[in-house]
Amino acid sequence: MQITREKWSKNFSEWFDWVLREGEFYDYGRYPIKGMGVWMPYGFKLRQNIIGIIRNFLDSTGHEEVLFPLLIPEDLLRRESTHIKGFEEEVFWVTKGGSTDLDVKLALRPTSEVAITTMENLWLKSYKQLPKKYYQIVSVFRYETKATRPMIRLREITTFKEAHTVHETYDDAQKQVEEAIEIYKKIFDTLTIPYVLSERPEWDRFAGALHTYAFDTIMPDGRAMQIGTVHHLGQNFSKALDFKIQKKDGSLDYPHQTSYGISDRAVASVIAIHGDDHGPVLPPSVAPIKVVVIPIPAKNEEETQQVMKYSIEICEMFNKNNITCLTDQDTEKTPGEKFYIWEIKGVPIRLEIGPRELISGTVFIKRRDNFKSYTVRKEEAINKIKELLNEIQEDLRRKAWEDLKSRIEYSNDIEKAKKILGNNSGIVEVPWCGSNECGLKIEELTNARVLGYPIEKREVNDKCVICKMNAKTVLRIAKTY
């Protein structure tokens, strides 16, 4: 079968809406509040699997899960002035309890730095309790005024993993930033999501942070999308909330903090990145169903029932070996209709079992990612499926990285950079002197967004595209979500 990616790349927005709807991942646009969608059972299971991977990586590195209230008092949210300025226009406010006006407005959590720091101030008193690493997976709310998009730009972000850590010194906090970056690399690698890692420029840091490091991927339409961020907060929040600890030398001082987050966009990326015109291709590491069995009816009812029995037996064999399998027993739909349904759900492997397989004691296997097919004996099926699931996982990761790298270009000419971005090409790297003035000018002239600069030192033997002074690094720019 020929694999095409025409709709996937050229009409990505329509493709994504179609996949979420027809694949029964997420119902968006019909719940009567803009920017809020409903996770359907199949999509919710995918979300759970992704959250499970995130939890495993955090739990295994000493993070402890907590759960904070949804509401934050206005006076508390305003304690860190730079922070509230960054979020003020996006906050949802609760102003009434029943018909009674509240004395203090309550914010629906846009993020939790001030709320968590408030409680850390009560819990943590000494360097002996540090480092301390908390995380929670919750809904956050942002009053988005731009066009909302399912899973990508929402007013309720339902899968917000935010980690918050406390350290005695700046250097300890920086080590935690480095650990967080490594954790995120492993998470995205397991999810088969490719990325570029950049430090955001000064004018685009998280409100209240000293440094912001961001993971961006490239979606099928060439737009870059932020999928994770890591922030070195320094002492900004601890000072604002008068949070002090006793240090090793006996003195009292403000601790240093970090925070880092991943959202619904991780799920959106998993669905989108490996797709084709048949739908998504879910990596086996998170697919809710790894193998679907499609019974092919025989010419008579008795043999058809035998085929169904054999199909169920094969599927049970996989489930007993921890390979999530489902037999499609719907007798109202044709095999072709079932192929369409399970392809748009992105199930990695399909088994087709008919009279021929029943008689020969074999199974017919088809991969979702490349539609290659194999016939193996029943007793060989477990090992073959395990082998293919590993191959699919690695092939998806490799091809996604190849695609991302092919969409990153270098240009030392601002007009050429603008033209490349106009063709929805992905990310352009331009030589940059390091000044905010030139960086903002690059954004203005290209009508694009600056993603930042590489965190590793990059030798650039070129001139800044704006001021023509010697470049210190490259600045990454892209059309973004």
Swiss-Prot record:
Domain notes: Consists of three domains: the N-terminal catalytic domain, the anticodon-binding domain and the C-terminal extension.
SUPFAM superfamilies: C-terminal domain of ProRS, Class II aaRS ABD-related, Class II aaRS and biotin synthetases
CDD domains: ProRS_anticodon_zinc, ProRS_core_arch_euk
GO molecular function: ATP binding; proline-tRNA ligase activity
Similarity remark: Belongs to the class-II aminoacyl-tRNA synthetase family. ProS type 3 subfamily.
Keywords (A to Z) from UniProt: Aminoacyl-tRNA synthetase, ATP-binding, Cytoplasm, Ligase, Nucleotide-binding, Protein biosynthesis
Lineage of the species this protein comes from: Archaea, Thermoproteota, Thermoprotei, Sulfolobales, Sulfolobaceae
Its job: Catalyzes the attachment of proline to tRNA(Pro) in a two-step reaction: proline is first activated by ATP to form Pro-AMP and then transferred to the acceptor end of tRNA(Pro).
Membrane-traversing stretches: none
EC number, as in UniProt: 6.1.1.15
Name of the protein described by the UniProt record: Proline--tRNA ligase
Subunit structure: Homodimer.
A Gene Ontology BP annotation from the UniProt entry: prolyl-tRNA aminoacylation
One Pfam family it belongs to: tRNA-synt_2b
Naturally occurring in which organism (per UniProt): Saccharolobus solfataricus (strain ATCC 35092 / DSM 1617 / JCM 11322 / P2)
Catalytic activity from the UniProt record: tRNA(Pro) + L-proline + ATP = L-prolyl-tRNA(Pro) + AMP + diphosphate
One GO term describing the cellular component: cytoplasm
Subcellular location: Cytoplasm
Recorded superkingdom: Archaea
